[in-house]
From Swiss-Prot:
Its main location: cytoplasm. This is Holo-[acyl-carrier-protein] synthase. It comes from Oenococcus oeni (strain ATCC BAA-331 / PSU-1). The gene is acpS. It comes from the Bacteria. It catalyses: apo-[ACP] + CoA = holo-[ACP] + adenosine 3',5'-bisphosphate + H(+). It is found in: Cytoplasm. Transfers the 4'-phosphopantetheine moiety from coenzyme A to a Ser of acyl-carrier-protein.
């Protein structure tokens, strides 16, 4: 096995400003299921959730080495909370990282510091870590 790691840090208020400025931000960044989970958030939790998802998708793109753009779209990456509230990452479409055995994700919010930090770990079958 080999591993690919992506890490990202975002300002919650910067993500909030982008969402408020660009009407299509939510549709561009979040899947419909993620938007449903977001709708249940109130107050600071709303933008912390949004920033966490945005940052997680950036971290995934970094782990693959593709970046967001021609091979990786935000909405091909979905991070939903499981029954215990832990984030679970799934990938579809062009963003699927071939030979990936598993995806692990960690999202840390520090609202008082206006930061969200994320890490994505991709476990890759030996022999080919490229898609």
């Amino acid at each position: 096995m080999s591993y690919r790691i992506g890490i990202d840090i975002e300002s919650i208020s910067d993500v909030q400003a982008a969402a408020e400025k660009h009407k299509q931000f939510l549709d561009k960044v979040l899947t419909k299921s993620e938007q449903k989970q977001l709708a249940g958030r109130k107050g600071n939790g709303y933008y912390a959730y949004l920033a966490g998802r945005f940052s997680s998708k950036e971290a995934y793109a970094k782990a693959t080495g593709f970046g967001i753009g021609s091979k990786v779209n935000f909405t091909d990456i979905e991070i939903l909370d499981d029954e215990n509230g832990a984030p679970r990452l799934s990938v579809s479409g062009r963003s699927l990282f071939l030979n990936a055995k598993s995806y692990q994700i960690s999202i840390s919010h520090k609202i008082k510091l206006d930061l969200v930090a994320t890490e994505v770990l991709i476990e890759v079958e030996d022999g080919n870590s490229d898609s």
